[in-house]
């Protein structure tokens, strides 16, 4: 199968799973997943499945990336916080849609590798930082959108505080060894509103920094 055919099949799979927003599809068409996957799994970059990366983490399956991004309803003026850089793939997608992206990860190795990819791809509106993402990034708050790519038993209150009124947060909620639910949180002047997207399985949101050098 040619590269063009694989990409067409990739986009068809996204649409069939409910990713229909044209801006999101365009971003995912233009950000190649391949460079974010290393080693023997690189040849499976166009398959709709999660794959292992360094530090015991995973790169999410593309359809879930698409659905989470779509649920954020990002405008070109938005400032976005991502908690859980991982491979950097999700942040790269966000960078095509938002004015500015801040992405945090507790593993310094993942942050270093993601920064290298962002530089190589000339994605200049992403700032990647080694930090405990459960505390957010207070010096850049508030954020128009927040995306959390690790599961918490409850949405962290600190992140809720750093979300603008009128903002949207997408986060997987549930225990790491049980069914998790992908939740969309809308922050209004009257409080918080919650919608459930689907069941998912994510690595847990952990406190502290990873011991990976």
From Swiss-Prot:
Record protein name field: Protein-L-isoaspartate O-methyltransferase
Paired cysteines (S-S): none
GO cellular component: cytoplasm
Primary localization: cytoplasm
Record field: catalytic activity: [protein]-L-isoaspartate + S-adenosyl-L-methionine = [protein]-L-isoaspartate alpha-methyl ester + S-adenosyl-L-homocysteine
Alphabetized InterPro entries for the sequence: PCMT (IPR000682), SAM-dependent_MTases_sf (IPR029063)
Keyword Ribonucleoprotein carried by entry: no
GO molecular function: protein-L-isoaspartate (D-aspartate) O-methyltransferase activity
Domain of life (superkingdom): Bacteria
Role according to the record: Catalyzes the methyl esterification of L-isoaspartyl residues in peptides and proteins that result from spontaneous decomposition of normal L-aspartyl and L-asparaginyl residues. It plays a role in the repair and/or degradation of damaged proteins.
Keywords: Cytoplasm, Methyltransferase, S-adenosyl-L-methionine, Transferase
Cross-referenced Pfam families: PCMT
Listed Gene3D superfamilies: Vaccinia Virus protein VP39
Catalytic residues of the enzyme: 60
